[in-house]
Amino acid sequence: TNVVVTDPLSWQYFGKGPVAYGSLFQGEVYDALREPAVEGWSTASYDASAWKSAHEVALEGHISKAGNPNMPWVNDYSGFELIGQFGQTVKQINELTALSVEEVRPGVFVYDMGQNMVGVPRISLSGMQPGTEITLRFAEVKYPDLPEYEGNIGMIMLENIRAAMAQDIYIAKGGQETISPRFTYHGYRFIEITGIDKPLPVESVKGIVLSSIHELASHYETSNARVNQLWKNITWSSYGNFLSIPTDCPQRNERLGWSGDISVFSRTATYLADVPQFLRRHMRAMRDVQRTDGRFPDIAPLGGGFGGMLWGSAGITVPWECYQQYGDTALLSEHYTAMKRYIQYIIDQTIETETNLIVQTRSWGDLCDWLGLEDEKNDKSLVWEAYFIHDLDLMTKMAAALGKTSDAAWFRDLHAARRDFFNKTYIEPESGKTIFSAFIPDKKGQPVDIQTSYVLPLAFGIINEENRNKVIANLAETVRRENTTDRGRLCPSYSLMTGFIGTAWISKALSDYGLNDLAYRLLQQTDYPSWLYSVEQGATTIWERLNSYTHTDGFGGNNRMNSFNHYSFGAVGAWMYNYSLGIQRDEAYPGFKQFILKPMPDPTGKMKYARGYYDSMYGRIESGWREERGMIHYAFTVPGNTTATLYLPAASLRDVREGEKLIRKCKGIEYIGEGSGQVVLKLLPGSYSFEVKKEYPMAGKKRKKGEIARSKGTH
């Protein structure tokens, strides 16, 4: 075997090629007049006599000169080890064509791509004078026609990209040529082009969409067109922010791997696309910058940030989601020591001896329920405690999965103790309302009583049996009533008052405890604050704020801190798959070898159907339901070499038939049990259809005389 390599000291470089400048944040400068100097550079006949020899540079020094005590970056190159690239590569996944062009000022042409996208342009030119300088600038939105924006109306809005210049400069050579940057990327819907005398045809302006998500692994569709657009917005924000690392946003001078964002979105991500290697790479980045005391960073790579426990918990939740979705313990094994060190850090460094409360300082972070509309009314220690208990629950299960029985027992005991502490500290036993702890001494014992304060302990199974029904009722009340924001704005019933953290769990908490009607009302609410409010305002991606833009108030004064491509509020996507479609993992069988089908039709009747699929490692799982003439029709597909546990709403097995046949006589269907208005069946591989009276989706509802459920199936 011959191994052919080159000596690095024999490498050469040419410093005056057409790419004069390239930066992810600032854009690219390309001088096409320099192209002849490097034409044919990779051929044997090319004359490289003018090229210079490369020389070795030590990997030392600092990554950034910026200094911020609240964002302690891993800033020293020393100790860094170069490794081979792994994860999911960035590639072109789509190509868009501009829909329209407007000359907003003389010589200033703005093209609308019709979709907020992430990538680079591909612009065809001809007949340009050599040396002509063409400038491209990129924006997600334009200034609307409102009095406060007089003088800028119709121009692209660049305030929200802050210190990122995000522009490309192209110096033309003449003839047929193409502008297509290689050493940058942009988040944008609108392209401003200057330096040309007249507008280019819209078909000459393309958008090359880049992503580490190469294709979707799922689909979701309903009778509600706005909900369908919301799902599309979630997918586009996933495309745009899964770019080598899971970023918070793709356009401004940030584009960082904020851990809180991927923590709340990881379950949705695993259903949207096949991302195990992408997330495994990110967990490597989190370990690389884990502090010596065990604290996970709030940003990875590089580290730093000021998010706190809820952000650091990504180091626990993401491995768990990957394990459950893909059934592979490899990530658990390589990440386990880091997770255990993190738990020990919480115990040693954040639990106050005198009060037993988890206490955080600004040096670690206190973002809490970021951008929640009632966040200032919350007891932050309640949220921190709930997440710590959730982390302990996951660690118990992951330790057991790895056969670490003594660790699992330790985590289980600690989980039980902290769960008991939560119920005694944060729940008023008579009313079941959440209350302030001694974290804020002058408020101790006063009610918190906001959505997030109930959502987290319910979603995480923290509330004990004595308090549970009262806490559920209190959560329901916070959803049904009008609420007032921290800034004094009155919001209508069925408003989404939660931030990044609470929003990820609110629909699950409602559906887990029989409040599906409220979950669907929240999903389909169009008034502010809600998921569909942004859809009503023309959004094509998920926004950082629920009101990043409105037709009446423009940007509401949030011009700078305002991303229009931020997937965190899109974490509701997991509920769409897990509850609306009912495609759920079976925790006892990670990876969908065995799984659960538990669809929950809309009890309000506003949504008439939902259907979709998830492409598991074993094949496509399909689920759907539709309401028609007083009946709910269900359809499922179970892929080969798997089995599904189906929870079908019906009063008893006697009411479930295949045509006129009893279920016990149907091939591919096995009876498991019944109760609480549900019949539980085991489905072998095949396609199935069932129908039940509309009343049945409300679990526990009594069957009226003469009502039956019918089924048809093939396997």
Show which residues each predicted segment covers.
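C-terminal capping/lid segments that line or modulate ligand- or cofactor-binding pockets
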Residues: 30-32, 253-254, 272, 315, ...
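Extracellular/oxidizing-compartment recognition motifs
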Residues: 1-252, 277-280, 296-301, 330, ...
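Active-site acid/base region of carbohydrate-active enzymes
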Residues: 2-20, 190, 200-233, 239-240, ...
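Active-site-proximal structural scaffolding
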Residues: 44-47, 116, 127, 163, ...
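Non-catalytic C-terminal accessory modules of carbohydrate-active enzymes
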Residues: 4-40, 81-89, 94, 144-146, ...
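Alpha-helical support elements that line or immediately flank enzyme active sites
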Residues: 120-140, 194, 259-289, 316-332, ...
